Amino acid sequence: LPLPPHPGHPGYINFSYEVLTPLKXYQSI
């Protein structure tokens, strides 16, 4: 199984925006 992106991984920022940001939006509803 692929490991989750590390904080130093280039894709970590994209992962945060695509996952954490939508979660915040859903919580505000």
Curated annotation (Swiss-Prot):
Q: Which organism is it from?
A: Oryctolagus cuniculus (Rabbit)
Identification of the protein by name = Amelogenin-like protein
The SS bond pairs are: none
Family in the record? Belongs to the amelogenin family.
Its annotated compartments are:
Secreted, Extracellular space, Extracellular matrix
- Entry's Pfam families? Amelogenin (PF02948)
- Misc. comment: This protein sequence was found in 70 kDa-, 20 kDa- and 18 kDa-rabbit teeth enamel proteins.
**Primary place of residence?**
secreted
Instruction: Give a GO molecular function annotation for the protein.
Output: structural constituent of tooth enamel
Which superkingdom, per the lineage?
Eukaryota
Its job:
Tooth enamel proteins are produced in ameloblasts and play a role in biomineralization.
List residues modified as Phosphoserine.
Answer: 16
Biological processes annotated in GO: enamel mineralization
UniProt keyword terms in alphabetical order: Biomineralization, Extracellular matrix, Phosphoprotein, Secreted
A single Gene Ontology CC annotation of this entry is: extracellular region
